[in-house]
Amino acid sequence: MMLLPIFLLLCIGINLIRAESCPPSQAILPCRCSLRGKEIQIWCSHSNLPQIMDGLKAVERNIKGRIDELVLENNQLPALPGRFFGSLQIVRLMLRHNSIERVSNGWLNELENGLVEIFVVEPQLRSIPAESLNGMINMLAITIQSEELKHLPDFSGLLSLTYLSVQTGALQELPSHLFRHLPKLQHIHITGGSGLTRLEAGLFDGLISLKNLDLSHNGLNWIHLRALSRLPNLVSLKLSHNQISDVGMVGRIVKDLEHLKKLRLDNNLITVIEDGSFVDLPNLSELHLNDNRITELQYGAFLRTPQLKTIYLQNNLIRRIHPESLLQASGSGVEAVHMYNNEIGHVEALRALLDALPRLRYLDMSGNLLSELPYGALRGHGTLEQLHLNHNHLRLIERDALMAMPALRELRMRNNSLSSDLPLPFWNLPGLKGLDLAQNQFARVDSQLLAGLPSLRRLDLSENGLIELAPNSFRHNPLLETLNISSNELTKIHSSTLIHLERLFEVDASYNQLKSVIAGLPRIVERISLKGNQITSLPAAASKDLQLPNLRMLDLSQNRIEQLPRHGFQGAMELRVLSLAQNELRQLKDTSFIGIQRLELLHLQENQLGEADERALLPLAELRNLNLQSNKLEAITDNFFSNNSRLEQLDLSRNLIRSISPTAFDTQRSLEYLDLSGNALLDISVGLGNLNNLRDIDLSYNQISRIQSDVIGGWRNVVEIRLSNNLIVELQQGTFRNLPKLQYLDLSSNEIRNVEPGALKGLDELQEFVLADNKLVELKDHVFEELPSLLASHFQYNKLRYISPESFHNANSLVFLNLSNNHFRNMENIGLRSMRNLEVLDLSTNGVKLVSTMPLKALNWLVELKMDNNQICRIQGSPFETMPRLRVLSMRNNQLRSIKERTFRNVRGNIAILDVDGNPIDCNCEMQWLSVWLQETNFPYPGPKCQDGRLLRSARMERSLCVGADIYGNERTDGNQLPLLNEHGDVFQRDLPDDFNDECEAGEGTRLPGDRPLVGESEYFYDQYVDATEAPDTTHSAISTSQRPKPTPTINSNIDLNNTILHTKYFNRKPQPGSGSPFTFFGYPLPSVSLGRFFGFGDRGRKQRTDSNDDMPATHRMAHISLPSGRGKTRMYQPNSAEFEKYLKDQQKQEKLNIARNRYVDTDSTTSSMEDALSNESGSAATTVGVFRTTFREPSSIERGGFRPIVPAHVGGFMPVHDPQQRRGLVEVVNITGNPSEIVQGIGQRKFIPISTQARPKPTKSSGESSETATYEVTETTPDITTTTPLMQRIATSTTKASTTTTRSTTTTSTTQVTPAENNASSSTELDSQYDDEDLEAQSVTLLRPPPLVQTTTAETILLIPPAEEHVAQIKSRSWVTTTTPQSPSDNQVTLAGPTSTVPPPPPASPPLRGGGRSTITKVYTPYQQQVAQPTAEEYQRTTPSGDNEGVASEHQLTANAQKRTELELLQVDRVDRKDGMDWYYESFKKKRDFNGGAAVRKTAHKEVFYDGVAASSSWNRLHKEILFISLLLLWRAC
């Protein structure tokens, strides 16, 4: 009895522990669980209604406590039934993009007491029952976003509700009973209803706690006088973006809102502010009237508004302001007026404002039509501090026009037409401290211009065309601190011009024509910029021009300096930053930097340095950043960096370095970043092994042939290693050991042929590695071992033909795999078994011909699958059936003629993009389902074409021709579709009609020399048949129909062969009468009856083979063996008995996958650097940017976008959730070089083109030109599709609804600038000309077509959750770019042949060159029922032409009467047989089979028995025997 309480306490403790922890992922699929502190979050995605319901039930079984957040996202849930969430204890609920159209009345039953917040983002949601929210006593926040919701549920009675947000485009009215009895409601947001035009009386009556009411973005044009009555605590009212034209109506409505402080009426239709518009608003402090059509402020517009402080009137059409529009009592407190971008052309309006607003402190009149300021126009205002008159038409300012303004501190008059020819001085402003006169026409400056400004501190005279500064120009401004005279035409500045300015600390004289350093600078100066001048030499040490003891920054870049004087900088002992980049320096002497011991940053890039004294840097003991990029250094000696122990960043790229001394970096214990790319290194120097603190090293574009593990083993803190574009041949075991912090490894574009097992073992933090563009042929077992954090792998542009199933051992986090542009012929050769967590798989541009079920069976989490540019001619079975989360499936440019509806039956509801363009589709009744689907889903692309050129979506099939087919193209038959099989899976030949032909027959069964044998290919297969007689050798060309003994039309659709796997072939033989089996059991057809087999005699041979312990494969290609008599036998093998049971209508339960989903780690996503090829290099080797540097980013943790409870005085809700109608990321637009039609077809050869840039680029004033330094931006755009062409340049772009506007773009062939209009016109016109024939295609133009050359995929689509805002930094430039030069179509084009010609395309003349690649970031969402173009999948773009891979040669064809092995096929490379390491393949058919709802395992008396060659269990034989025995008993009893 004493043990019972202990047992109960133990059970309670276990339950408490389970309640506070997450169950394993496989237990609650398709949901996932994560912890955030002590809070539990459940996230269910990419599934359908039955799976989600099963997942929620599993969650209910495994989690007994409360669930803090439940997120259902990107599912296919058309409706939510009652008690959908069961008895789960949900605190916060999020539904986002699940295609929900309606919910039942009791969908939230049993959640009344616990639910605190609801967040619903469902664009297709049409109805929410009015009473569905009743009883939610603890509800604090509700958010609903939809496009179809016309009627809102009843919110009344939610006593705890504090926050309500509803955004719907179909809302037309707001009944008054919706908002009753809400005593705690503080915030209401009702937006987006363009049909909501009226607000009736008493709508918000009695909301005593309401503080913020937002009714913006609706169609309101009438509001009842008492619609907003009895809101005693309302502080903010937002009515912007409506159709309000009567501002007086609003003024009368808000008159009773005593505590109203902020009123927003911007973006309406207001044309005039009439008398009495705003009266008796005692607490109103901020009024927004901007972005209307206001032309006039009339008399008495504002009356008794004593607290009004800020008025926004910008972006209107104001021409006149009445002097008494703001009466003295009303305008006495106004402090800021924004009036920019109006049409005020007379200074009287400006004067009226100043007179009416005696306390005005800020006035912005920029962007108006003011042309002159007469005498005394702006005088006598005692409080004005800031006056902005930028971007007007000012040509005349009379003498003393600005005076008697003692408080004025800042005056801006940028971009006018002022000149020094006007009467001076303009002003008498003793308190003015900042003056901006940039972008005017002052050619000369003398003392009269700045007279009357004794307190001036900051002066901007840039971009004026100045040619002269008089020596006494600043005589009246002794307090001047900052002077900007950049971008002028000054050639000399007199030494006495600035000498008396004792407070001057910054001078910017960049981009002038100065020949020498400015003389006579005051000793207090701290910052000097002389960038972009014509300075050829620096003053000698004896000169006082650089005797500046306080100087901290000196920029002398982009000049013509050839040498540095001895001790030239010793007078600037406080110098911290020195830039001598882009000059003509040829050597560094030991005395060049003496005297500047405190220097921290030194830029010497892009000079001609070929000789540097090893003592030149000895004085720089404090140096932290050194840039020697793009010089001509050949070696790094022992003592060159010996005294720079604090160096943190060192750039030695693009030199000619061949050797590094073993002791060169002995003292660099602080070095974190080292760039040695673009040199001539032959190995990784031993001297680099001492960099213990190194975090980032770039050794790409060298001639390194071997990686010394003992050297890189010293980089214990390294995070990124780049070794691309070298000559590395092999990765040996343990090459990258002892690198515990390594996250990114780039080995692309090398000569790697072999990766030994364990070469990348034990890298616990490795997230991404790139082995693209190498010469890999196969990946063996345990090549990539123990990589728990690995997320992405890149193998594109190799020669891969085989990947072992155990190649990724203990790498369970892999979610992105790129295998495009390889030599895979069969998907069975890709070991995907251990990659169960894959979400993105790219198999584009291989030689795959058949897509079958088994190779893809384990990919339950796959979201995106790309198989473009293969030779796929058939999809067998249902390979996508186990992919409930599949959103993107692309099979462009293959050989598919027909696509069965049943192939996509289980994924049609969830898939967003199904791209089969470029296939020779037969537009017959079988394809009608796809045509209907394209129309029903409003698919944003034109879709595939028929062979006659029509679009499939617009093709119409007559009903009379499709009598036997349903709406999905499935042929209806009254007969039995089950093929007649024996217990081995043989199909009797009498069931195969004469007109049957396998579409892929001519292309199967052959391989190139050196390919591994297929799975299951062994001598045992041929033991079942008589030996074949050798046939004469055949040619490699396609076999024409004349060579065949008889025509072979397509297969009769009455025969369903879906229960077979991989490849099936049949001889043509006339069928026996009747299509079904003569034996049935209760209507189910029975296979062939063999009494000998029934009593055991038929299994003798199989038992003997089984006892010999030969592991037989699970699948095999069909074999045709020519017999002397001309008769043949056909074998078909089944993967398991469960496939056949589908025809017997037995429901088979899928086994739960034991997969670990540990990839959601809450880490900060870091922005990967994406390198451009946009700079100049002279005298060095051609070096390109890092080719396969991707922008893969670790997936955001699922907590991002979660809930924060919304309570008073607390910001909460789903704040980070991004609007799905907008895309984020880089949209890259480039110019098209060459013939557009050839480029679209993917034909071309890449070459490198150097860019020649000017030595000193000047800023340009034209909007169509770009300056020397481009700014790379990330813009949020509407979801229009922007076509990305192969040649890519990073530019700032913005995409609008119907067009793409490019702000800056440059061509790659010259320095000529291309205007945005020219760029868009050239690209769109040339490409649009291809689609003039079809109306639907003409509507799509090119923005709706995926890029033809996109064949690879980046990893940003892994989660399909919008990431947080990215901050893309400006990246260093490169001097070489890649472009695509078109070739003739005959060089590399694939011509589609007829049914009997399946000759593969010839290989290219040479392997693909190493080239640049770039990522394009887009997002994929479910295509909703609206006219909104959906973005394409994220794609990894390679700038080299795809072509066909090296070695993709013609395969041998099978004739109709024989199958022979040619001499070429017999010359196979001697490899380990495929069966070694394929135990997992055979084990999959040893699993327990659930035949009758149980899990019984059927065993024979001896060891387990397999089917001949197909690894089938003996249970199927036993089932045959049992069925036959029962049938015989029934027949005996009937007799």
Curated annotation (Swiss-Prot):
One of its GO terms (cellular component) is extracellular matrix. The keyword Hydrolase does not apply. It comes from Drosophila melanogaster (Fruit fly). LRR repeats lie at residues 64-87, 89-110, 112-135, 136-157, 158-181, 183-206, 207-230, 231-256, 257-280, 281-304, 306-328, 331-356, 357-380, 382-404, 406-429, 430-452, 453-476, 478-500, 521-545, 548-571, 573-595, 597-619, 620-643, 645-667, 669-691, 692-714, 716-738, 739-762, 764-786, 788-810, 811-834, 835-858, 860-882, 883-906. Keywords: Cytoplasm, Extracellular matrix, Leucine-rich repeat, Repeat, Secreted, Sensory transduction, Signal. The keyword Secreted applies. Residues 1253-1270, 1316-1328, 1377-1391 have a biased composition (Polar residues). Residues 1398-1407 have a biased composition (Pro residues). Residues 1-19 form the signal peptide. InterPro entries: Cys-rich_flank_reg_C (IPR000483), Dev_Immune_Receptor (IPR050328), Leu-rich_rpt (IPR001611), Leu-rich_rpt_typical-subtyp (IPR003591), LRR_dom_sf (IPR032675). GO terms for biological process: cilium assembly; locomotion; sensory organ development. Residues 1271-1285, 1293-1315 have a biased composition (Low complexity). This is Protein artichoke.
